[in-house]
Amino acid sequence: MTEPWIAFPPEVHSAMLNYGAGVGPMLISATQNGELSAQYAEAASEVEELLGVVASEGWQGQAAEAFVAAYMPFLAWLIQASADCVEMAAQQHVVIEAYTAAVELMPTQVELAANQIKLAVLVATNFFGINTIPIAINEAEYVEMWVRAATTMATYSTVSRSALSAMPHTSPPPLILKSDELLPDTGEDSDEDGHNHGGHSHGGHARMIDNFFAEILRGVSAGRIVWDPVNGTLNGLDYDDYVYPGHAIWWLARGLEFFQDGEQFGELLFTNPTGAFQFLLYVVVVDLPTHIAQIATWLGQYPQLLSAALTGVIAHLGAITGLAGLSGLSAIPSAAIPAVVPELTPVAAAPPMLAVAGVGPAVAAPGMLPASAPAPAAAAGATAAGPTPPATGFGGFPPYLVGGGGPGIGFGSGQSAHAKAAASDSAAAESAAQASARAQARAARRGRSAAKARGHRDEFVTMDMGFDAAAPAPEHQPGARASDCGAGPIGFAGTVRKEAVVKAAGLTTLAGDDFGGGPTMPMMPGTWTHDQGVFDEHR
């Protein structure tokens, strides 16, 4: 009897009883049940009086009899509900009395604390065993309080459980119908226990786990949810009586129903396998579609819930199918992308240096004759390159943007301070010198291209490609002359070098005298003429 409670010390039981909710909530509930019983009794008396008036004065014949017969079940339910409320209030008072008695019998916290303090003092002053007998008496008192607390809790638990089981459960009110002919006839037989054997049956006998869950539901809901696994009812109604999924109790009824279905299927599987699969077929074909139809009807009444559910389902399906579709991308042949390969000129045919449109490269010729400047038409034609450019022509970008040979005169210029003699001004001599210089320059470029090709070149076009007018003959082309206003032989196109001015180039050395013969300082273009008029007359 005291098995669950004897394992705990009396301090635990005393704290649970003295520091709990007390009898206040139970007294309020008992009072409300008494008031509810009085209201049910008053309603029953009103209905009974109304039925008496209808039967005696208001109506006559079969209509009056049908009216009275239709309301008689409801009148009986009102009377029974009033009696149930009275019985429930009485059982609650029994629990209140049991609680009060348990509090009186339970050792208080003060008594338990005093016993422990006394024991500590006796043990501390137990010199030569003089307190042995008082210590034994004190421990015996504590054991007695331990047993008394366990017995008190066991008695209180037994009385409370018996009162709880004796409390009646009020069934829902019956329907007010004219006769039993309006009730649906399912054509299914039931035994005296009320279990349906022709179709989907619930209940039969309660298992230990069913009773455990029933107690949990009752405790969590404070008695508002009563599950009867024996009869297969929830709050007095069969599972199938809950047809509206908008109520939370519908989902609870479905969960309990399928839980008991699983238990019944497991039992039949070991005792009657054929009946087990017939039962499973009925659940899948009849019971489950019925509940699905109820959910569909409920969602149809609330389109926003249906749209939200469909949106979530479609989103998840779209994600799954999208990931599955990625696996098929490897089988799709990719579109052929044409590789852009620049058309390169053979290394042997390319010049060793790039030219800039409008700037003519200087070529060292015999006698230090300056190279002739390109014609304006040639400078304009360098920007219109054809689809298949020839091997010679002007480049498309300045050569100083890339590394390599440069425009022809590097940092280590080999020109000395002693200038050569000026070229003849006659047109015939210049034409002959230019032709010879071009021939030698082409030979030198071919040799240098074969020896070392930089590899940073562009396509070249011919000067006369894409133009209506033919390029001028070499003998009529003006020669390129270095100007004092330019950067040496690669000066501005169309300028003429001033013959009277000595060109500044590189470092100069002094005569080998007492002051030395080494380089002193670079020659700066201090002898250039900065007068704009002088510059214009030589253009």
UniProtKB/Swiss-Prot annotation:
Subcellular locations according to the entry: Secreted
A Pfam entry, by short name: PPE-PPW
Compositional bias ranges of the Acidic residues kind: 182-192
Single GO biological process annotation from the record: response to host immune response
Primary localization class, coarse: secreted
InterPro entries attached to this UniProt entry: PPE-PPW_C (IPR043641), PPE_dom (IPR000030), PPE_sf (IPR038332)
Span list, region Disordered: 179-203, 433-459
Provenance organism: Mycobacterium tuberculosis (strain CDC 1551 / Oshkosh)
Source superkingdom: Bacteria
Stated family: Belongs to the mycobacterial PPE family.
Biased composition (Low complexity): 433-442
Name of the molecule in the record: Uncharacterized PPE family protein PPE20
Keywords carried by this UniProt record: Secreted
Biased composition range(s): Basic residues: 443-455
GO cellular component terms attached to this protein's record: extracellular region
